[in-house]
Design a protein with these regions (language model features):
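N-terminal nucleotide-binding beta1-loop-alpha1 segment
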Residues: 6-12
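Short beta-strand segments at enzyme active-site cores
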Residues: 53-60, 163
Length: 202
């Protein structure tokens, strides 16, 4: 096992992934793409656990009255408009099967309220305490929280691998464009290759 790697699992939550969720990023209940994403996300978490890699599960949530939401752009205004990811309710909870292991000392949860999972959170401190220098990042949506977090991670000195098939956007073309853009600052690979990269001695 390489001790300098952590996995970031971003927004694997009911409102984002469940067929009855309020966001869903285009992942309809009968969508083959949706099932592939769920399977790949599960494989990423399983792979990380099999190599005893730390996992930081990042969730987005707001007060039910959205008083803590800064509505400075459409992506946030839309969250409040549709009533998504309210704290303490089903929508903001982790999707069943992709949740943290309750009894694990290698899994952590960080809550955020902006685009980057680092902004205004203890994520960087957590990763430094773990000794992480390399990150495997995956989540939904590719072009928002994933790309925002990857760019922030690169700026503060982490080497990043994006597990591309454990990510998704509502529009596959937007997903592909985001991955292409991130390749300037990160590597991208399918889950199986990303896990091998993480587990390899550095």
């Amino acid at each position: 096992m390489s001790a300098d790697v952590a996995v970031l699992a971003l927004h694997y939550q009911n409102d984002v992934l469940h067929a009855d969720g309020k966001i869903r990023v285009g992942l309809d209940a009968d969508s083959g793409a949706r099932q592939r994403l769920l399977d790949n996300a599960a494989a990423l978490l399983e792979g990380a656990r099999s190599h005893a890699l730390p996992i930081v599960h990042v969730r987005i949530a707001f007060r039910p009255d959205y008083a803590d939401l800064l509505p400075n752009c459409d992506i946030f205004r839309n969250v409040a408009r549709i009533g998504a990811v309210p704290e303490g309710q089903w929508g903001s909870a982790f999707y069943d099967g992709l949740q943290p292991l309750a009894d694990s000392t290698r899994e952590f949860v960080v809550k955020h309220t902006r685009i980057s999972a680092f902004y205004g959170t203890p994520l960087e401190e957590t990763l430094r305490l773990l000794g992480a220098r390399r990150l495997v990042v995956a989540g939904v949506a590719t072009h928002s929280v994933v790309e925002g977090t990857v760019r922030h991670a690169a700026d503060i000195g982490f080497s990043v691998m994006v597990a591309e098939d454990a990510c998704a956007s509502a529009d596959p073309a937007v997903h592909a464009a985001s991955l292409a853009s991130m390749r300037l600052i990160a590597q991208t690979a399918p889950v199986a290759d990303a896990v091998r990269w993480a587990a390899a001695p550095n």
